[in-house]
Amino acid sequence: MNQYKVLIPSAGLGTRLGDFSKNLNKALVSLDNKPVISHVIEKFPKHIEIVVALGHKGDLVKDYLQMAHSDRQITCVDIENYCGNGSGLGLTILECKEYLQCPFVFCPNDTVILEEVPEPTTNWVGYAEVDNNH
């Protein structure tokens, strides 16, 4: 598969992060002295377009991306209804539909990628069971 994009949703409030995301978009929370969104972006080749869905404190993320990743093709999509009734990941992906008319890799900004991401060769979906009792 030669042409694909990467979708990084970062529209929500990040409430699971508590005070870390109160005044900051969750994508900008620092991990090893670098915003977590940079860790995600840097796992993909520079020629791959990145689509970032933004809501809560989205302007901060846009400013950061322009400064830190000016050498990348990054499309920011503003999600108006990022919290409250009708909001959610499904709506966020739907709002990005216009920019994702090709295969894409879905990569949440709160997922730490430790290995290089292989170029997708087929369509696939991955999942993992999560113990919610922690």
Language model features: what each stretch is:
Residues 1-8, 16, 30, 34-106:
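Conserved N-terminal catalytic core of the sugar/cofactor nucleotidyltransferase
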Residues 13:
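Conserved SAM/SAH-binding loop
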Residues 19-22:
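Conserved catalytic-core motifs of eukaryotic protein kinase domains, centered on the activation segment
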Residues 105-107, 125-126:
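Short hydrophobic-aromatic micro-motifs
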Residues 109-112:
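The conserved acidic donor/metal-binding loop of glycosyltransferases
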Residues 114-134:
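Conserved core of the sugar-phosphate nucleotidyltransferase
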